[in-house]
Swiss-Prot record:
NCBIfam families assigned: PRK02399.1-2 (NF002674), PRK02399.1-4 (NF002676)
Alphabetized CDD domains for the sequence: Tm-1-like
A Pfam family hit: UPF0261_C
Record-stated family: Belongs to the UPF0261 family.
Protein name: UPF0261 protein BMEII0128
The organism of origin for this protein: Brucella melitensis biotype 1 (strain ATCC 23456 / CCUG 17765 / NCTC 10094 / 16M)
Source taxon at top rank: Bacteria
């Protein structure tokens, strides 16, 4: 396993007409840290006092327009949206040609808006850093944040350099260069399996499945399905980074259908199927919606069973009608898959608190989901029921048997056993 080149190419993105002092300082820090800054100017009205690697005209051209047309668009929102489109297309092309080892962008709200788009299209594990006056604020929708994005508050910045600003910018530049130098790209030595889960207090199948899959010569990447983890899982699936997936925690679909902010976006449970990756699916935690524990419970859930996991996140069970709706959404997503799908239904419960005597146990509501799934899936999906809880050994053994059968049939590539 090797890291990037000793002089990683770092895209430095900002409006050079208004932030030239800061951007030139950042370029200098990147060079002193051993990186190669690639300046991308996203100015609109003015010009930077330096020659960028990619000018605002290059950015506009990448959006299929001109700087003058962008100026004539009528307002700063439309203008920056067009520059974001162009900068995103430009960086995407550079990345596809292997010319991007990392990115760092600087901005207030306009620059951050643009930078979020660029970070979102870069592959997972390419270091991404945004220095922003609105870092980690409520202005940033979770669905726009790349799953491996790093941010730092541009404290004391916005209008020229000062000691605080220099400290912030130098930290950020050192971080992105260090990450680009030391990052280990995923190994191709063994085929990679994707798996979703919640913490082991809720779901436990990975304790059995991970070592068994590793014995068979696979690497296993497990994603914490609390919004950002699902986004990372979907990003790798979209890149065709898995040979198969065990998508056993699909609660993020329930979250999305219930309006929770703990979302992984509208494409949850879609990218693996679209990429032709074989999927083994189970309804882990599909009975719950996650909400921030520090916010008031929404009115529609105030009479539902509630479990506070910690001070950050709480789980609330959804009604039988909501579970039926989620089942229909899940079935529709899976039916579009371009590779085999096996859906395994554990009839004894779908998370640890869904047991007799536990606070979130609602067998009638679980039955509503199971009934809807039975009727919603078509013949393109293999449908199996296990008379056991999702955390029982019988469930994990059934899932492993499906996987082994697929390997024997050539549906999944064989593992690399040393």
């Amino acid at each position: 396993m090797t890291a990037h080149t000793n002089s990683p190419r770092i895209m430095v993105i900002g409006t050079g007409d208004t932030k030239s002092d800061e951007l030139l300082f950042m370029a200098d820090v990147i060079e002193r840290a051993g990186g190669s800054p690639v300046m991308i100017d996203v100015s609109i009205l003015g010009n930077p006092p330096y020659e960028p690697a990619y000018s605002k005209h290059d950015v506009a051209e990448a959006a299929g327009t001109t700087v003058q047309a962008i100026i004539d668009s009528g307002d700063e929102h439309s203008a920056m949206a067009l520059m974001a489109e162009g900068a995103t297309a430009l960086v995407r092309g550079l990345s596809q040609r292997g010319q991007v080892d990392g990115m760092i962008a600087l901005g207030g709200s306009l620059g951050t808006d643009l930078a979020l788009d660029i970070a979102a299209i870069l592959p997972l594990v390419v270091p991404k850093f945004i220095v922003s006056t609105i870092a980690y604020s409520h202005l940033l929708p979770p669905e726009r944040i790349a799953p491996d994005l790093m941010m730092i508050l541009w404290a004391g910045g916005l209008y020229g350099l000062n000691p605080i600003c220099r400290s912030v910018l130098s930290q950020a530049c050192g971080a992105v260069v260090g990450a680009a130098k030391l990052v280990e790209k995923p190994s191709a030595e063994k085929p990679l399996i994707g798996m979703t889960h919640l913490g082991s207090s809720c779901l436990k199948y990975m304790r059995f499945l991970k070592p068994e899959l590793e014995k068979r010569g696979y690497d296993v990447a497990i994603f914490h399905a609390t919004g950002m983890g699902g986004r990372a899982y979907e990003a790798v699936a979209a890149q065709k980074g898995f040979v198969a997936v065990f998508d056993f925690c699909i609660q993020e679909v329930t979250n999305a259908e219930s309006g929770s902010v703990v979302t992984s976006g509208p494409d949850r449970m879609e990218n693996a199927g679209r990429a032709g990756i074989p999927q083994i699916i189970a309804p882990g935690a599909v009975d719950m919606v996650d909400m921030p524990a520090w916010q008031n419970v929404p009115e529609q859930f105030r009479d539902r069973p509630y479990h506070a996991h910690n001070r950050l996140i709480a789980s609330i069970t959804v009604s039988p009608e909501q579970r039926r709706a989620v089942a229909r959404v899940v079935a529709a997503k899976l039916e579009r898959a371009a590779a085999p799908v096996a859906f395994i239904l554990p009839t004894g419960g779908v998370q640890e608190w869904d047991r007799n005597g536990e606070p979130l146990h609602e067998p009638e509501a679980l039955g509503a989901f199971l009934d809807e799934m039975r009727g919603a899936v078509s013949g393109t999906i293999t449908f199996e029921e296990v008379d056991a809880h999702i955390n029982a050994p019988e469930f994990a053994s059934r899932a492993l048997a499906v996987f082994d059968r697929w390997v024997a049939e050539g549906i999944v590539v064989k593992g690399n056993v040393a």
